[in-house]
């Protein structure tokens, strides 16, 4: 659990990578990295392999989380950004519910098969990344973004809400689930159900 959060603290290094890689390409690369890390977790022979795949997966996830809002804002004009960002959030929430619901229904009728779930989830993620690379053209940035780290005092509320959202995710998605399984022996389907309710 601790290793998984190291890339989260290093997510700001995405700014340095963007000096050499276009932001759109970096986002797609992050998505593919997330998929690869997830897929190869299924083949873990040792605990060290699990640590390695967790870090790979986490780098992909945290870089993607860092980039997706920024990329959306560059793609959209200032007039259409609020509406489209809201639609993207709605779509993301729906997909989250659909995936968790599908996993829960699967667990109700079939025995848990970690190998299949990890390979399938990772494979789908990689396929989406390749599709994005091939199908979505490189777009010109409508808003030129500064490639430097800066803080603005007037954005303090946004920073606070982002921090609290991250803390909430850590508590409910990461550590609470781990604690319920490790200390209280919760079944996998019950953890999925709790995550589904939390996502709703």
Positions of the model-derived regions?
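Short amphipathic helix-loop junctions that connect adjacent transmembrane helices
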Residues: 1, 174-191
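C-terminal ends and interior cores of transmembrane alpha-helices
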Residues: 12, 32-46, 105
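Transmembrane alpha-helix termini and helix-breaking/packing motifs in multi-pass membrane transporters
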Residues: 12-20, 97-118, 177-178, 182-183
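Hydrophobic core of transmembrane alpha-helices in multi-pass small-molecule transporters
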Residues: 37-38, 48-64
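Intracellular juxtamembrane helix-capping segments at the cytosolic ends
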Residues: 63-76
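C-terminal membrane-cytosol helix-exit motif in multi-pass small-molecule transporters
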Residues: 103-107, 122-141
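Juxtamembrane intracellular "pre-TM" segments in multi-pass secondary transporters
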Residues: 134-167, 183
